[in-house]
Amino acid sequence: VFINAMGMRITEEQRAQIKKAADGGLPILTTSVTNPANEIISLDSIQADTLRSYLGNGGRRNYRSMLNYVRKHIDGKLISVDEPEAVTERSNDMIYHADPKKPDDEELGFNTIAGYNAFLQENGLLQEGAPRIIITGMMGEPADLIRKLEETGNVVYPVRNMKGFIGRHQIDSVFPSAVINMAHGRMGDYIVDYLAQQNIPLFTPLNVNRLVEEWENDKMGMSGGFLSQSVVTPEIDGAIRPFALFGHYRDEEGLQHAFAIPERLETFVETVNNYIKLQNKPNNEKRVAIYYYKGPGQNAMAAAGMEVAPSLYNLLLHLKKEGYKVDGLPASSKELERMIQAQGAVFGTYAEGAFDNFMKNGHPELITKEQYESWVGKVLRPEKYAEVVSSFGEFPGEYMATDDGRLGVARLQFGNVVLLPQNAAGKGDNAFKIVHGTDAAPPHTYIASYLWTQFGFKADALIHFGTHGSLEFTPKKQVALSSNDWPDRLVGALPHFYIYSIGNVGEGMIAKRRAYAGLQSYLTPPFLESSVRGIYRELVEKIKIYNNAVNACSNGAHEQESRKDMRSEVDLRRASLAVKAVAVKLGIHRELELDSVLTVPYTEDEILRIENFAEELATEKITGQLYTMGVPYEDARIRSSVYAMATEPIAYSLLALDKLRKRADEKTVKHRALFTQHY
């Protein structure tokens, strides 16, 4: 029995059972032990070392010899067993490739680009001018991926040691268009620097590391250490498209083997090729679909912290400046907004008159049943489409439908750039729930818009404009999506870019992982001070008088005669009532749920709460005008934003240092006004 004990967590009872089997004569070898308690070996040292050597060097030949060694020298089967060969040391080849003439044999190895290119040339795999793609990493079986990439016109360089490949400058003569990393952990800063220098994408297809049917039925998709190592840490390297590609299948003996999932392989390779096409296709030929968000009727477009209409208009102007075909662009953002209200609207089911007018004058794209069903057949499994029909009826449904059975898709087209509203992803009155996810399939209108973008408009790139839409919240898996999950199907193989607020990292991660989006950050509105300190000036003065009275009482108890002590108590009561009068006048007592009886003084703790509340409001950060893409902050707004972001971390760091030096105590922490004054 071979046990890979890396990270293995078993109970004491389970461990005892394994030890009992080993003591009873069952041959057991544990490898990659991370917990010494799990190191259970019932072989002699020679046998254990021999098996470790076979495993450590890997390869078909070594594994075959290892099994023969087990049969002959451990299991005692001496008849009809081939003599095990000596261990073949693992080659340190930089590049590997299956032998096209003997694909089931050991992979061939190469240490020079010239030698590998000669091999490719000899086997008809080196195409002049073809994109070159590097594959690296260990969390997958890349044979089918390499073959499919080559079949679709690429030259593939499977690399064992990417760091060495870059460090020794062997990569310099490859000029790759993309890197594919079958990731388990970070590659490191060296790859970040290289990707930035070359301006090429890094893809990280996922190995779900279990039977395909188990993964497809799992609502989570991936979790724990595999999520961290396969999705989270590769994002630090700049990886995009965490697309489930590899899974396990059983052979005729019931053993599991990792392979590329056939339908996923087709989509992934098409995705990689589509990104590479963007590098080479002239800008005036690229077709771009941009989705924006707005509520029904005359509601304005929306995106967190952004002035949408002028920002979208600035993007269109910039695309035109960069050579994209943007025809018929209006003269101003106001005019663009008017056009969107007329031709790119979203309607509630109640707005029959406005809907009829839109269908006549809004120039929607009209989709026939034949078109729609042909597109659905390409991307959706029958059972997924059955969910749609069950919830919304047969195409075209009741919404955005014409009398002759076609479905209207709102859009504004400017040459090769089309603007589309994102329709509601469900039905009902709870807009927040519809945007942030339900368990139901999206309606025909939602699906048809995205499928028209893919197959009708034939977009080269998909953009979602602003934070945030509903696509990344459609059902079902959290990450490592399958072909049964709606974002996976509606994005398809399109390169996807999401203009996303830099202030919403958490939901941005959802867009990256569930909608395969490359995030392009936009700024939050600038930060300003609240400017309400003047409102609380009288209150602050009264609290200062009260604090002085508290100090006088504390000192008087030990040093002053009883008469002066009584006078201090009277002053303290008077000061507390004065604070209370101002606090009640300002309504602070309601916020803090304090009483408003003006003849009963507040306690010291209650006044401390009032002081901290007022100080918190006085120092609270507020945001200024909404951000417009392409328009930099004014200098004053840059300064106020930097102060707002940096002041508190610096102040609390200084406080921490003063506490270490015994220059500050808990009193400073409790009194926000004192903290603000000192730091």
Feature annotation, model-predicted:
Residues 1-679:
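Ligand/cofactor-recognition surfaces for anionic moieties
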